[in-house]
């Protein structure tokens, strides 16, 4: 009876251990080109937090990765994923990021893909609302944090040791990392230079890493592509001035219910709160935030990796921000500061901070849309073809 009971358990353990021991490089061939293409607009967290789909994408010169946060999901006819699908310029946008994906999350992701970033053109959209006084918090960090990428950082010898130490110290401030016993102890030992402890923890950490790696590989080969996306032909073969006119018309049609040029369905939900929000943000600013330190780490990683990024700095909805009392200085100081950081590294930047009051540039209070996407499309097109950007 005991043999019957323990036999399947022992067999399952042997099979599990065998699966973990198989080198992942043997299995990456199961990630098809079709699977990578499907994931380009799926906005699936399994891809953001993994390694393999992004690895395959970064190796392919026909993909242009676009990193950002919640604005990437605002898919409309002017969105880069639609525009460059119907206007073939030789590349396919690949979207990486979701709400709460801020500088530290992207730093971790870039560190995990340093060997694929050299000479790679990428686009990175920076959002002002990341730079609040407290910076990234647990609510936004935890759902986007990747234990696999966190462990990859610990074993990463390509990253500058000082940047690596800064990243580990910063990440140890979050409960999502603190509650991961193996990773948090490994980080602490590395930060404090406790070599004996690092060596003692490494075997368990490597088994843990291998388990997460196989899980990522499974997701990379089997997950569905998500809901079918509608492709609009309305932007095909149009000049930039024609696209601007079309975006104006679309924005006007979809935001006619309010004076803030906010998308009608969004404003419908916001409307009951509008009177209470008047003047509520007096004294606030985006000029002081720990996010600047996280952003600097990310810039350093991209610089060390030899990546070729174009940053897109988007504005806020000026009319709405004025209504809520958010001081203009608290916004302009941010624009100046973040653009200075980017340019100091020698990176290209499409600075759209001058469009706060441009109707239909923003789709709501903080997310780009309609005309804003047209400007972004133009900047991407110019950057991809010339390596430089003059759009603003």
Swiss-Prot record:
Extracellular side: 26-392
This protein's UniProt keywords: Cell membrane, Membrane, Signal-anchor, Transmembrane, Transmembrane helix
Keyword Cell membrane in record: yes
Topology feature Cytoplasmic, residues: 1-4
Residue stretches in coiled coil: none
Domain of life, source organism: Bacteria
Pathways per UniProt: Cell wall biogenesis; lipoteichoic acid biosynthesis
Function (record text): Involved in the D-alanylation of lipoteichoic acid (LTA). Could be responsible for the transfer of DltC-carried D-alanyl groups to cell membrane phosphatidylglycerol (PG), or alternatively of D-alanine residues from D-Ala-undecaprenol phosphate to the poly(glycerophosphate) chains of LTA. D-alanylation of LTA plays an important role in modulating the properties of the cell wall in Gram-positive bacteria, influencing the net charge of the cell wall.
Annotated protein name in UniProt: Protein DltD
The organism of origin for this protein: Bacillus subtilis (strain 168)
């Amino acid at each position: 009876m005991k043999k019957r009971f323990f036999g399947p358990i022992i067999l399952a353990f042997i099979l599990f251990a065998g699966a973990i021991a198989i080198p992942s490089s043997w299995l990456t061939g199961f990630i098809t080109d079709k699977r990578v293409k499907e994931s380009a607009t799926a906005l699936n967290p399994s891809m953001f937090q993994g390694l393999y789909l992004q690895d395959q994408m970064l190796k392919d010169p026909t993909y242009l990765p676009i990193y950002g946060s919640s604005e990437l999901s605002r898919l409309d006819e002017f969105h880069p994923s639609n525009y460059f699908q119907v206007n073939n310029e030789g590349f396919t946008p690949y979207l990486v990021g979701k709400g709460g994906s801020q500088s530290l999350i992207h730093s971790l992701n870039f560190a995990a893909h340093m060997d694929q970033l050299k000479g790679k053109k990428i686009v990175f959209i920076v959002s002002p609302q990341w730079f609040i006084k407290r910076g990234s918090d647990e609510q936004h960090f935890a759902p986007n944090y990747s234990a696999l990428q966190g462990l990859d950082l610990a074993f990463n010898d390509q990253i500058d040791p000082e940047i690596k130490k800064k990243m580990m110290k910063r990440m140890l401030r979050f409960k999502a990392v603190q509650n991961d016993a193996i990773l948090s102890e490994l980080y602490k030992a590395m930060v404090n230079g406790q070599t004996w402890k690092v060596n003692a923890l490494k075997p368990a950490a490597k088994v843990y890493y291998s388990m997460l790696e196989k899980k990522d590989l499974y997701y990379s080969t089997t997950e569905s592509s998500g809901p079918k996306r509608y492709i609009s032909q309305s932007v095909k073969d149009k000049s930039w001035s024609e696209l601007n006119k079309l975006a104006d018309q679309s924005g006007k049609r979809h935001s006619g219910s309010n004076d803030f040029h906010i998308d009608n369905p969004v404003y419908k939900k916001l409307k009951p709160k509008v009177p209470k929000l008047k003047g509520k943000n007096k004294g606030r600013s985006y000029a002081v935030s720990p996010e600047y330190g996280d952003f600097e780490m990310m810039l350093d990683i991209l610089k060390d990796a030899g990546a070729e990024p174009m940053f897109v700095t988007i504005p806020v909805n000026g009319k709405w921000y004025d209504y809520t009392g958010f001081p203009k200085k608290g916004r302009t100081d941010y624009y100046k500061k973040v653009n200075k950081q980017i340019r100091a590294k020698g990176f290209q930047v499409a600075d759209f901070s001058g469009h706060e009051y441009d109707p239909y540039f923003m789709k709501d209070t903080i997310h780009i849309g309609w005309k804003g996407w047209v400007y972004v499309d133009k900047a991407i097109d110019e950057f991809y073809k010339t390596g430089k950007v003059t759009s603003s």
